[in-house]
Amino acid sequence: MLVLIPFKPVNPKTRLSKVMRKNERENFARCMLLDVLDALSSFDCDIKIISTHPFKIESYDVVVDSRELDDAINSRIEGETAVIMSDIPLINSRILRRFFESEGDVVIAPGRKGGTNMIIIRDRKFKVRYYYCSFLRHLEFAKSLDLKCTVFDSFYASVDIDTPDDLLELMIHGEGKKSYEFLYSIGFRIKYEKEPKLVRISNTFP
């Protein structure tokens, strides 16, 4: 299986800029990518990181493509292709095994806010359409092509990290992950209240 992982190494995750400096966001994005790659490490996949800028990571094939995400992905779909986002660090090999074994011409793991966090494409007629509630758009497109579409249900796969609120989920569930360790190292902690909150106790920001 071909696995494509989109990645933005330069000035990523701008919605986290209120709680992280630019260099911290870049390091954090890399840690999340490494968590995703760790989850994939036990599978015999052809992994390609589709990066918006030149970027090196040992033992992996990085392809630089500055086009819009849809174009960068659709031009590389071949045979059985999975697209896995680089900002879902809570996934693990057990989740991926269930995902890869799911039946269907198209298998979609939705994000919590209507996005598409993972997708398997087994029919080349299908093309990705990211953003603008891509989960529903992908369902509708598969239906229009008369393709069997399976929705893959996984909480951990649904947690993509974009906003400060998302960081709380990672700090609650992500112990042992590189991205969790990075957040902890720069002072993020959980404040135990009736509704847990995320606080930063060191390396005062900004």
Swiss-Prot record:
It catalyses: (2S)-2-phospholactate + GTP + H(+) = (2S)-lactyl-2-diphospho-5'-guanosine + diphosphate. Gene3D superfamilies: 6.10.140.50, Spore Coat Polysaccharide Biosynthesis Protein SpsA, Chain A. It comes from the Archaea. It holds the Pfam family CofC. InterPro entries: CofC, Nucleotide-diphossugar_trans. Pathway: Cofactor biosynthesis; coenzyme F420 biosynthesis. The keyword Nucleotidyltransferase applies. One of its GO terms (biological process) is F420-0 metabolic process. GO terms for molecular function: GTP binding; phospholactate guanylyltransferase activity. Its EC number is 2.7.7.68. Transmembrane segments: none annotated. Keywords: GTP-binding, Nucleotide-binding, Nucleotidyltransferase, Transferase. The keyword Nucleotidyltransferase applies. It is an enzyme of class 2 (transferase). Homodimer. Guanylyltransferase that catalyzes the activation of (2S)-2-phospholactate (2-PL) as (2S)-lactyl-2-diphospho-5'-guanosine, via the condensation of 2-PL with GTP. It is involved in the biosynthesis of coenzyme F420, a hydride carrier cofactor. HAMAP family: CofC. Belongs to the CofC family. This is 2-phospho-L-lactate guanylyltransferase.
